[in-house]
């Protein structure tokens, strides 16, 4: 498209005339697609459409204001021609020139075409200022640099027709006309069939399968639990309806049982030879036989057996604790948990021993190890009240021996809170029987076991809690005051108070908790003595 050179707009003397210098010619962005390629000569029209005075000579008020403000005062009225003359070659076809004249200077008889909402006429002073030197630089309005709607429609129809005829147009998606970037194509598309993709996905899902998801996929399980809790809270508040959240469901594939043909001997450093068809060997030959020297050291290996038993019981306890967080139904959870707790209690349950020096007792061996104390403390909340009370009585009866074995570990204090919850379940007869065991004199000793209890923090705390519970039973049940058990209880309290008075104040341990109802009773007992 060439420049417009020497465009002169002339009208009657009452109107205006504008002269544009060739070097300041305007560039037109319009070019028709149907313009002939072999048209080299410029076509110039000497006679332009007549601009009538009535009926708004220029189509756009903005153009009228621009031309009126840019006219030189001395040039007004110099040209009296009634037509607009164009000097110089325009360098465009007659059809293009004719369309440009129609768009800039529409006839009065034809209405002005406006596309889009009507815009107010701009201020003429925006285009020209008196202080601006001549000639000013003009720019055509936006509707002169765009295609005519009819021509743009023809161009779009031709583009659609070309896409239909091209064989590759159907596979390539149509590109938007305003998109400058070419359509992106995936070089790796359609390399795998849908069946192959499903097979790869199935293999990946099998790798995610786990028999213990809480251990293998802990963070995802916790995330999903928080997500379900958040949705449940929103449902309670009425913010949203109940909707199933997306959860990863892996296919279940039963794993075959692994059979180990290797004979393993506990304590051996190497691997025992495997029986094969080339070197047959009976499994009984691989079993180790104990010697007389090993039998003499059975006492030293007894601790190892106790530690092994504690480890096995601890693994069962961990399964019980994990069962509470699995989200299983309450009925199934209670039935399964009660059976596992019963197995653990049967492993700890022993017959009550009157001999305090009985070292072979199973529960005493477990409580002699720090991890065994942790095991019993974590097992107590799962036990029924009757089983927990039996453990409480057993620990109270053997309390002096347990304190002597706890000098190095100092771990008995972790049993105080779990045992303190079941002290209220003791009857008066059970309490009296447990307290009498602390006052028995050991053979060949003049010191009562209660003196050892008073010098230990766990022992004195448990003793004060038992005395407080006994005082509550006596005060709440008037029938006990007239019975023989009440007299025995009074003598027992006096003996304990006497032992406390005999010990120096520095030897008494500081209790973990001091009952409120024990101070008045101690004061009355001390006054009566």
From Swiss-Prot:
Protein name: Protein PAT1 homolog 2
Gene Ontology cellular component terms for the protein in this record: cytoplasm; nucleus; P-body
MF term (GO), any: translation repressor activity
KW Nucleus (keyword) present: yes
Swiss-Prot/TrEMBL keywords: Cytoplasm, Nucleus, RNA-binding
Job description of the protein: RNA-binding protein that acts as a translational repressor.
A Pfam family per the record: PAT1
Superkingdom as given in the UniProt entry: Eukaryota
Stretches the record annotates as Disordered: 153-183
């Amino acid at each position: 498209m060439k420049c417009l050179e020497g465009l002169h707009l002339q009208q009657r003397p009452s109107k205006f005339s504008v002269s544009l210098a060739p070097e300041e010619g305007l560039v037109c962005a319009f070019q028709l697609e149907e313009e002939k390629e072999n048209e080299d000569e410029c076509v110039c029209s000497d006679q332009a459409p007549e601009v009538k005075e009535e009926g708004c000579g220029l189509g756009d008020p903005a153009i009228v204001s621009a031309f009126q403000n840019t006219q030189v005062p001395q040039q007004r009225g110099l040209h009296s021609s009634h037509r607009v003359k164009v000097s110089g070659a325009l360098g465009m076809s007659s059809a293009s020139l004719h369309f440009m004249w129609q768009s800039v200077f529409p006839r009065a008889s034809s209405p002005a075409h406006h596309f889009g909402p009507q815009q107010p006429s701009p201020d003429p002073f925006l285009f020209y200022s008196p202080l601006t030197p001549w000639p000013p630089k003009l720019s055509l309005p936006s509707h002169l640099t765009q295609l005519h709607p009819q021509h743009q429609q023809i161009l779009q129809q031709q583009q659609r027709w070309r896409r239909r005829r091209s064989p590759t147009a159907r596979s390539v998606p149509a590109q938007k006309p305003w998109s400058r970037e070419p359509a992106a194509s995936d070089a790796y598309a359609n390399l795998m069939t849908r069946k192959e993709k499903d097979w790869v996905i199935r293999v990946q899902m099998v790798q995610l399968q786990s028999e213990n998801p809480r251990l293998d996929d802990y963070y995802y399980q916790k995330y999903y639990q928080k997500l379900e809790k958040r949705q449940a809270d929103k449902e309670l508040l009425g913010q949203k309806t109940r909707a199933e959240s997306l959860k990863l469901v892996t296919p279940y594939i039963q794993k075959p049982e692994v059979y180990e043909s290797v004979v393993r001997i506990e304590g051996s450093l190497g691997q025992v030879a495997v029986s094969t068809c080339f070197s047959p060997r009976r499994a009984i030959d691989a079993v180790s036989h104990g010697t007389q020297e090993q039998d003499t050291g059975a006492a030293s290996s007894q601790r190892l057996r106790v530690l092994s038993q504690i480890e096995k019981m601890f693994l069962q306890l961990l399964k019980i604790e994990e069962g509470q967080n699995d989200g299983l139904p309450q009925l199934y959870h209670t039935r399964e948990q009660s059976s596992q707790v019963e197995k653990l209690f049967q492993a700890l349950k022993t017959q009550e021993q009157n001999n305090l020096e009985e070292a072979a007792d199973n529960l005493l061996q477990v409580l002699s190890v720090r991890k065994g104390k942790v095991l019993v403390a974590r097992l107590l909340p799962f036990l029924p009240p009757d089983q927990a009370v039996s453990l409480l009585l057993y620990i109270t009866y053997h309390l002096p021996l347990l304190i002597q074995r706890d000098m190095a570990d100092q771990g008995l204090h972790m049993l105080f809170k779990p045992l303190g919850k079941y002290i209220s379940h003791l009857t008066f007869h059970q309490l009296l029987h447990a307290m009498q065991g602390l006052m028995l004199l050991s053979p060949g000793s003049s010191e009562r076991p209660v003196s050892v209890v008073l010098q230990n923090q766990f022992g004195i705390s448990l003793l004060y809690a038992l005395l407080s519970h006994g005082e509550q039973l006596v005060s709440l049940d008037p029938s006990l005051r007239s019975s023989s058990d009440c007299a025995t209880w009074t003598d027992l309290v006096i003996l304990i108070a006497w032992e406390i008075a005999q010990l120096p104040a520095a030897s008494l341990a500081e209790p973990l908790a001091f009952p409120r109802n024990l101070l008045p009773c101690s004061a009355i007992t001390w006054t009566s003595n």
